[in-house]
Amino acid sequence: MAEFVLVAHGTRSAAGVENIAALAEAVSRRVGSVRTAFVDVLGPTPSEVLSTIDGPAVLLPAFLASGYHVHHDIPEHVALSGHPQVAITQTLGPDPVLASVLAGRLRAAGWRRGDAVVLAAAGSSDARARHEVHTAASLLARHTGPVRVGYIATGEPRVADVVREARATGRRVFIASYLLAQGLFQQRLAECGADGVAQPL
């Protein structure tokens, strides 16, 4: 039977680490034991975890879009481990279920119909990931009406700029956090000038 490894980005935020642990626990209730690995900031790495597994392994990328970490880092760790039997699942998003959760997070932050929505993602240099973020925005728009996209770390337009443009319409502006866990990026969203910021997924 295959062993499952949840692969996340990694964060120095204790709350973010707890978020990932809670996700791994939730997955384990569905599939059995789940180990956790990180591609950045924290350890163990996917290659380190894979080196301790004798049988087949399934890597579960805990990412909301398939950017550099998914297309480069994770396969590189698989190759580095030398493990002969590794399957890699798709990323968590975009997905209609996540869009529904995002809409709920927005309502909890005070958003009401008619307010402007900015979907904030970490960003990526990978065009595939950017396309997936726009797909996520389209899925969210089914719940909220038009959704603009902004990036926190990589890519344009930046979240603060998109919030400023949306505010020029005279409406309240809310940020939908397309982030998986608490951490530095979520903290930065509070500084973007919106009327409210939803909690991460």
Over which residues does each language-model region extend?
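Active-site-proximal alpha-helix that buttresses catalytic centers in soluble enzyme cores
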Residues: M1-L201
